């Protein structure tokens, strides 16, 4: 199991879109509980976090602070797993601090996923790399859906050759498919389908879509 971090495993405690500081964080317990269910039912052996952390690259926070946040979340997941009797799981994390969109580690590039799959391959005797790909599920919150800033998580999974679910689907919640299909994020902006016509709003948010 591979997870994006911000917006997927954690959210801001303040309810804001962006964290006020490093303490403005709340673990999404429903996501963790669903992950624990899968770990218990399917014998998951690896729980990993892969996350772009560009704030480090621009000097807003330190890599030590980000590592502390992510390791805290992994420790919480580990402790909850042990309480359920789930043992033998390896917990790992990979972050990209770069602001270079061509960095192979920066999502939507698949470098961090490749590293995680390589770690799984080393710990599983008799399993091929292709087997690891087939058994891996990545969960994220940048799927190109309405209200999301990007599709970088989804594209990353596709490039890496692993299955992908948006965190909403991971929780078993239904998406409004008519709404989703009417508004799609692309590298050019948001595509709106209306009366058999296609309209493209070029980057309406005025920010880099990171695709």
Identify what each model region corresponds to.
Residues 1-211:
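HAD-like aspartate-dependent phosphatase fold
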């Amino acid at each position: 199991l591979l997870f994006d971090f911000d917006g997927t495993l954690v959210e801001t405690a303040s309810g804001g879109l962006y964290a006020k500081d490093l303490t403005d964080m709340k673990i999404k317990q429903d996501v963790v509980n669903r992950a624990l269910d899968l770990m218990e039912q399917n014998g998951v052996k690896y729980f990993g976090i892969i996350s772009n952390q560009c704030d480090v690259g621009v000097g807003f926070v330190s890599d030590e602070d980000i590592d502390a946040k992510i390791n805290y979340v992994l420790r919480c997941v580990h402790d909850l797993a042990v309480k359920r009797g789930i043992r033998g799981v390896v917990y790992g994390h990979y972050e990209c601090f770069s602001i270079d969109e061509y960095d192979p580690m920066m999502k939507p590039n698949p470098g961090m996923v490749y590293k995680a799959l390589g770690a799984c391959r080393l710990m599983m005797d008799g399993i091929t790399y292709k087997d690891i790909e087939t058994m891996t599920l990545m969960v994220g919150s940048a799927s190109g859906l309405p209200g999301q800033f990007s599709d970088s998580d989804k594209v990353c999974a596709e490039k890496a050759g692993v299955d992908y679910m948006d965190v909403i689907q991971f929780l078993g919640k239904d998406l409004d498919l008519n709404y989703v299909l009417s508004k799609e994020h692309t590298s050019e902006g948001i595509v709106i389908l209306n009366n058999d016509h296609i309209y493209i709003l070029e980057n309406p948010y005025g920010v880099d879509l990171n695709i």
